[in-house]
Amino acid sequence: MAHCVTLVQLSVSCDHLIDKDIGSKSDPLCVLLQDVGGAWAELCRTERVRNCSSPAFSKTLQIEYYFETVQKLRFGIYDIDNKTPELGDDDFLGGAECSLGQIVSSQTLTLPLMLKPGKPAGRGTITVSAQELKDSRVVTMEVEARNLDKKDFLGKSDPFLEFFRQGDGKWHLAYRTEVVKNNLNPTWKRFSVSLQHFCGGDLNTPIQVRCSDYDSDGSHDLIGTFHTTLAQLQAVPAEFECIHPEKQQRKKSYKNSGTVCVKTCRVETEYSFLDYVMGGCQINFTVGVDFTGSNGDPSSPDSLHYLSPTGVNEYLTALWSVGSVVQDYDSDKLFPAFGFGAQVPPDWQVSHEFALNFNPSNPYCAGIQGIVDAYRQALPQVRLYGPTNFAPIINHVARFAAQAAQQRTASQYFVLLLLTDGAVTDVEATCKAVVEASKLPMSVIIVGVGGADFEVMEQLDADGGPLRTRSGEAAARDIVQFVPYRRFQNAPRETLAMTVLAEVPTQMVSYFKAQGWAPLKTLPAPAKGPAQAPQV
């Protein structure tokens, strides 16, 4: 299943609607439909605006947003003259199609209304703007304790804290710290938890804090507890006495079982993927295609580069699947595309980063179709050779990512798609390249084409722990996602993209967060005129 990134709210307005009513203006309503398995399904509607040819609808349209899929939308405008919910007996004033990705990456998108393909609805236009529905605030705290009671017979306590919020007459666990072993004066790691989860968004919601001694069998011993609110926690430095109720009742001389000290407590904004995209961050998409000899002679039907009578192969299918999603987030739709592992004319030297269009000074292709065309034209002009070296292309994209990072703004993020038929040859150099790239605003997606052994690729994916170079340097973050194409060859085409792109939003946000870069503080983008509107 696709992973829902967030909920998006769409605001809709129209201009210059055609009039279908005699003696008055139309009474328009907007219907939102989504392509579900090739059929249009209605999601929601706005209210009807009476007697208006340029309505601004007050009711917003809500839709779940998924980065890793192309969500095709259709907006239909109808003149409502009766009380029935069916639209078949209402006049159609025009419609427009686009993807949700186009809307969120444009912030505001204006499209011409069409009565049918090729027939405009007069001068009518529809303008759609997107807003993310969320409370992005998080509570970030640093907490320590002093002079906690000793609970273990043969050693000191192993303390941890639990924070509970009150709701519906119950206490709900909001956060649990790590355990600090054998320490009566522990300092816990700084932590962040969403404001909504911590206190329901209310700074005065009662909070209970429990300090306990960890036992491996689960029978944790209470050290002490106290009650507070987030408002009180923010009054740093704040100290709270841990009180053990039974000890307090038994001993008149009892004071406390230690104190908990809040060193820092801040409510901060935690930016989301859409915050960055709608703030103007461009996702730069680059493609690298494997032209090594192990693919087989392209003229042979057994070759992975063989173009079927329909003009496709596994390489192109994977490219279309991933590229069709990413292209919506790049405003100029110009994508650099490279090949590697081939002997290239005119001197027939092996190259591991040659431009597919054979123009090294301008390797950009116009849209995904442009990459496909360049690939088809390059295929008969090169000699498949080897070895399979990834490092040159990774380093190539990393140089551009490093230049972007020097701006110290969340303006650009780079996604490299590598399509390959076999295990990487330059393992050490590739590991080093990935580790260096992990410090930059970029992600690497590797799709394994064919039936080779891709064990080394799984190591690059590093799901079991951080990737390390031979010298022991660890990747700053996980930026590689690998999948074998044949796992998805019998699944719908969008399934591959859903799998390989699902981690990109998290990877992008984690990088910008680590750098401390907020989304670009740009003014809302001006509405695109109909002539500029992206074509779907």
UniProtKB/Swiss-Prot annotation:
Ranges of residues in domain C2: 1-113, 122-244
For the ligand (Ca(2+) 3), the binding residues are D152, D158, D213, D215
- Location relative to the cell: Nucleus; Cytoplasm; Cell membrane
Q: Where does Ca(2+) 2 bind?
A: D21, D79, D81, D91
What Pfam families does its record include?
C2, Copine
Q: Which GO terms describe its molecular function?
A: calcium ion binding; calcium-dependent phospholipid binding; endopeptidase activity; identical protein binding; NF-kappaB binding; phosphatidylserine binding
Q: Which domain of life is it from?
A: Eukaryota
Where is it made, tissue-wise? Expressed in liver, brain, heart, intestine, kidney and lung (at protein level).
Domain comment from the record reads as follows: C2 domains are necessary for calcium-dependent cell membrane association. C2 domains are necessary for neuronal progenitor cell differentiation in a calcium-independent manner.
What's the protein here called? Copine-1
Q: Which organism is it from?
A: Rattus norvegicus
Q: Which gene encodes it?
A: Cpne1
